[in-house]
Swiss-Prot record:
Recorded family membership: Belongs to the diphthine synthase family.
Keywords: Methyltransferase, S-adenosyl-L-methionine, Transferase
CDD domains in the record: DHP5_DphB
Name used for this protein in its record: Diphthine synthase
Species for this entry: Archaeoglobus fulgidus (strain ATCC 49558 / DSM 4304 / JCM 9628 / NBRC 100126 / VC-16)
Phylogenetic classification of the source organism: Archaea, Methanobacteriati, Methanobacteriota, Archaeoglobi, Archaeoglobales
Keyword Electron transport: no
Enzymatic reactions: 2-[(3S)-amino-3-carboxypropyl]-L-histidyl-[translation elongation factor 2] + 3 S-adenosyl-L-methionine = diphthine-[translation elongation factor 2] + 3 S-adenosyl-L-homocysteine + 3 H(+)
Amino acid sequence: MLTFVGLGLWDVKDISVKGLEAVREADEVYVEYYTSKLLSSIEEMEEFFGKRVVELERSDLEENSFRLIERAKSKSVVLLVPGDPMVATTHSAIKLEAERKGVKTRIIHGASISTAVCGLTGLHNYRFGKSATVSWHRSQTPVNVIKANRSIDAHTLLFLDLHPEPMTIGHAVENLIAEDAQMKDLYAVGIARAGSGEEVVKCDRLENLKKIDFGKPLHVMVVLAKTLHFMEFECLREFADAPAELERLVA
């Protein structure tokens, strides 16, 4: 069997009890840090789980996933994934391939940044559109996604690139403005270290967010829709120090 276990948002202690049981009962345990990161080292995980943990590279998942699946034919194999296992399409593809080859699969979900941003900001989950990634290699894609979402009055969750190093909100804003200068006037929320207990959440225009020191990664951003529900505005004022002028978006 191949079991996908979500590790949650911050460190190894965010794993669920059910996930912990699966790890301790497994024959082999693997972890991947390509699609996301966790602030726990392999050594810390091994000490916590009392089990050897092998880190997989991107190629192990995308080009050579058949090797993992072959091992799961005769053994209980766990793949640890930061956040929730099925947010990344890579893991859905592995699950599909495994099932087609007769290998049973199981998913043990974990907390995801996709839902955590709603709790940290007060933004309504149903008002989010398509998400995008701001990468170190500049691309028009995030700007296009923001514009498309705003055309339907939806918020945009922006993941920030992790390779070769985690991107900061400041760098992400610079990339967006470099692609489209009009981005600087949009309101957004910057979120740092979700799930750590030491989160930083700030709301302002993009050009002002760039000047804020959010501290160490991991960082994400939400570019706001054209309008806000009055409760979203109240929450942003309270949770994210949003400027009073943001009230003009309430509809």
